[in-house]
From Swiss-Prot:
Keyword NADP: yes
Name the UniProt record assigns to this protein: Glutamyl-tRNA reductase 1
Top-level taxon of the source organism: Archaea
Listed InterPro entries: 4pyrrol_synth_GluRdtase, 4pyrrol_synth_GluRdtase_N, GluRdtase_CS, GluRdtase_N_sf, NAD(P)-bd_dom_sf, Shikm_DH/Glu-tRNA_Rdtase
Gene: hemA1
GO biological process assignments: protoporphyrinogen IX biosynthetic process from glutamate
Site, as annotated: Important for activity: H83
GO molecular function, one term: glutamyl-tRNA reductase activity
Catalytic reaction annotation: (S)-4-amino-5-oxopentanoate + tRNA(Glu) + NADP(+) = L-glutamyl-tRNA(Glu) + NADPH + H(+)
Swiss-Prot/TrEMBL domain comment: Possesses an unusual extended V-shaped dimeric structure with each monomer consisting of three distinct domains arranged along a curved 'spinal' alpha-helix. The N-terminal catalytic domain specifically recognizes the glutamate moiety of the substrate. The second domain is the NADPH-binding domain, and the third C-terminal domain is responsible for dimerization.
Residues engaged in binding substrate: T42, C43, N44, R45, S93, E98, T99, D100, Q104
Miscellaneous information on this protein: During catalysis, the active site Cys acts as a nucleophile attacking the alpha-carbonyl group of tRNA-bound glutamate with the formation of a thioester intermediate between enzyme and glutamate, and the concomitant release of tRNA(Glu). The thioester intermediate is finally reduced by direct hydride transfer from NADPH, to form the product GSA.
Annotated binding of NADP(+), by residue: G172, A173, G174, A175, V176, G177
Record-linked Gene3D superfamilies: Glutamyl-tRNA reductase, N-terminal domain, NAD(P)-binding Rossmann-like Domain
Amino acid sequence: MLVDKLYALSLSHKRLSVDELSEISRNVHKTCYNVQAFVFHTCNRVEVYLYDADAGPAEHIKRSYGPYVEKVAEFRGVEAARHLFRVAAGLESMLIGETDVLGQLEEAYESQVRRGNLRGLLKTVVERAVAVGKRVRTETGISRGPRGLGSLSIVYLSRRLPLREISVCVIGAGAVGRGVVKELIDAGVRRVAVVNRTVEKAADLGVEVRPLTSENVEWCLREFDVVYTAVSSFEPVVVYVPPGSRVKLVVDLGVPRNTAPNLPVEVVTLDHLRELAEEFNRQRAEEVSKAEKIVEEEVARLEEVLRRRWVELEMSALLKKWFAVAEEEGERAGGGPARLAAMSTVKRTLLPLVNYIKEVAVKDLAVAEGLLQVLKSAYA
């Protein structure tokens, strides 16, 4: 089975603290930078997914988890797919059903496709995971209440400070930061501002926006009661607090942590939110079984999806060549209508053949492999 070639490594909030996860994230990213792999790193997990990888590279990546390598969970085949689908569905999150993880998954997918690290059938697996996450949140009520760790932190904040009387600055306007800003506004916070690397990306939020500089980080600390950090950075964003600053609380949602140790102000991290998350997890217990049923349905379908995609990938080079030949012959015959007719003939002849081989692959992968080999030998 094609899904059998999938392999995953995972360390999450279930085995390590946020600070410990932050320790290993840089090394894992560095190890995987030029590798065909999908790295999914949030404040609650550091995971790597590989497809059809040799044992040597896989073991090398596993060792990049450093002092925590013995705590790494390994998943293979269907279990690896099931784990990724559960992560996308929010079933493995500290706050069950949270939506931030889905946005982060999409961001990781897009960036790694652009970089060229994610392609082939591994890309298809991640695409299916995103689709599963969306389906779970559409068909169940698992995300009712706080929709993410950002919104959970606002509940925490509301139990500490009067929201309508405070000012909040959010550093970072990615998926998590944007969600926090919108919920702060909805909660009636007196003043909200954003500091972000690109001002344009946060312009639509309808609040004051400044570029991410050390001066503007200081401005946040001096002028606001609460500062959120939600930046993807391997270096701390808040390294010191200027004397006389107004800030009472820093909420660090960064990946990894955005705050330097031993700051002279209270820093709230995700570890502080565990008890509150459990409170809402108990309320969502009934929806968990519905979400798990959807995950199992999608896991059962994955092999068929992979086989169809495998045929497309195997045939793509041949199709490209055949279309090029048809275009060339059409130009020789006078171009224009002749070229279009030649291209149309290729489509009418070959696309049904591709679809036929897809159906064969679903039933018998070995037979489909034989058909593809015949085509490659005859026409390559």
